[in-house]
């Protein structure tokens, strides 16, 4: 009995110390810890295909494929990495969310120097690329044997915000994208770094609400 109590008492301060050490990463004087969240909602010109969801996370970017659409996000001059990719589909729309995790829960940590942070605020570009996974040229044949070309690949200029650059393939009717870059230690430090936000939408020039449903990892 006494041995059990002794073991419990020994474990309690150790547990507290572990949590403190984890979040003490935010006390660094020469590093900042920034997080990123990218949300993409793409509506296609036809119902989604039944495909296997696939995702990939690489340095400074990630991608996800589902429903016949590949959504790729590259972070240029942002010094940030994604840790999770989630996706949700509904009839003719693909919803995707790319996020990072807190520095005390996941490696590699999104740490940067003050100079990197300044460059991020001035030069960070979130390059979003929507690519159709079906070659529509195979589906349209003129009676004289000449193939009909699909609509020209359309490049959407980054004239709405200062962070997002978006390229959308021919099968996408509408697209909405959000970007949030925030101080991961903002709730711990006395003075947090202001959050950077940007959005792009092709629907009436107004941002849609972010889908609240649960995103599945794939």
Swiss-Prot record:
GO cellular component, one term: extracellular region
UniProt keywords, alphabetically: Early protein, Glycoprotein, Host-virus interaction, Inhibition of host chemokines by virus, Secreted, Signal, Viral immunoevasion
Localization: Secreted
Induction of its expression: Expressed in the early phase of the viral replicative cycle.
Signal sequence extent: 1-16
Disulfide pairings: none
Record: glycosylation sites: 70
Pfam families per record: Orthopox_35kD (PF02250)
Record has Signal as a keyword: yes
Major location (coarse): secreted
Family under the similarity heading: Belongs to the orthopoxvirus OPG170 family.
Function: May interact with several cellular chemokines to interfere with chemokine-glycosaminoglycan (GAG) interactions at the cell surface to alter chemotaxis of nearby responsive cells.
Protein name: Protein OPG170
Organism for this UniProt entry: Variola virus (isolate Human/India/Ind3/1967) (VARV)
Lineage, broadest ranks: Viruses, Varidnaviria, Bamfordvirae, Nucleocytoviricota, Pokkesviricetes
Gene label: OPG170
